[in-house]
């Protein structure tokens, strides 16, 4: 209980900063629920109620604060169903990516939530029927959407700056900055990002497999549930590789454990130096073999 207040406040802060962090709030509640049922700690239901109340309440308090100071009713804003509709439609960048659809629908409805939601529900039904009738299109749509988000190694870190106005001014006039976006430095960065991402994914899979074999703790279940929730959410709702960067950072924790399992198996301390070296060389060969195939493709 000593950690309940600071944990709830930090969770509330994350929800206020980015509403999508409600995914992590749900993951925390699921992990707490599993812990309560497993250990029969029924009083811990208070913890779930408290963290939800603080997180949701803080978000609403921020809105109320702005309304009171401005004297303007901010309304509900764009409902999540509009972002679901956008996530199921085509985009100029990739399937289901940001396409300005949610905002356009809301504005065309004159900020009327009911009208905009009705339009979105109708369009969602049409899209679901199309996915049902054309399995090839459905598989192609979602495979491209998933890969374009999770397999984009820079997570738009360079692109998002490149499309801004300053790129056409001071950046083009600076040789080093221009190289970061278009030249040799750009190629080096993307190769590095690509390699780092690939290693992280491989080690993440090893780390998760090791934790499942070891029996996951409540904390591990919470984090894995959050990652799964983020994956499902951005597969269905409006997508961007930018959005999944936070989940990739969380995956690094599991990757570090995966690396630990690789370089230090049970009998590691009993192995000779030559055996240890062989283990390291085997790992290097696997990684560089995968990397070379990736580059060729």
Regions inferred by a protein language model and the residue ranges of each:
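Membrane-interface alpha helices of multi-pass inner-membrane proteins
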Residues: 4-18, 29, 51-56
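Perimembrane helix-loop-helix junctions
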Residues: 24-57
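Transmembrane alpha-helices and membrane-interface helical segments
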Residues: 24-36, 203-211, 227-231, 248-265
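Membrane-proximal stem/loop segments at transmembrane-domain junctions that anchor or position
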Residues: 67-172
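Membrane-interfacial, low-structure loops and terminal tails that flank and connect transmembrane helices
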Residues: 267-297
């Amino acid at each position: 209980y000593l950690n309940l207040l600071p944990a709830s406040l930090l969770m509330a802060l994350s929800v206020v900063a980015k509403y999508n962090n409600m995914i992590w709030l749900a993951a925390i509640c699921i992990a707490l629920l599993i812990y309560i049922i497993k250990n029969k700690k029924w009083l811990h239901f208070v913890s779930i109620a408290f963290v939800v109340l603080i997180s949701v309440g803080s978000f609403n308090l921020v809105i109320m604060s702005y309304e009171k100071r401005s004297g303007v009713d901010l309304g509900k804003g764009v409902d999540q169903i509009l972002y679901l509709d956008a996530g199921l439609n085509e985009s100029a960048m990739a399937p289901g990516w940001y396409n300005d659809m949610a905002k356009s629908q809301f504005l065309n409805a004159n900020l009327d939530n009911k009208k905009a939601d009705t339009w979105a529900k109708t369009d969602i039904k049409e899209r679901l029927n199309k996915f049902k009738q054309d399995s090839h299109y459905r598989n192609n749509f979602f495979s491209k959407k998933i890969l374009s988000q999770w397999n984009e190694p820079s997570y738009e870190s360079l692109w998002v700056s490149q499309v801004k106005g300053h790129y056409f001014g001071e950046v083009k006039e600076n040789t080093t900055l221009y190289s970061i976006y278009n030249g040799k430095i750009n190629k080096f960065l993307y190769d590095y990002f690509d390699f780092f991402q690939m290693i992280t994914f491989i080690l993440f899979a090893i780390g998760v497999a090791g934790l499942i074999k070891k029996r996951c703790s409540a904390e591990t279940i919470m984090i894995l549930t959050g990652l799964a929730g983020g994956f499902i959410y951005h597969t269905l709702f409006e997508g961007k590789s930018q959005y999944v960067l936070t989940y990739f950072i969380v995956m690094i924790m599991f990757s570090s454990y995966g690396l630990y399992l690789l370089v230090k198996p049970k009998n590691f301390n009993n192995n000779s130096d030559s055996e240890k070296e062989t283990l390291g060389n085997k790992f290097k060969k696997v990684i560089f073999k995968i990397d070379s195939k990736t580059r060729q493709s």
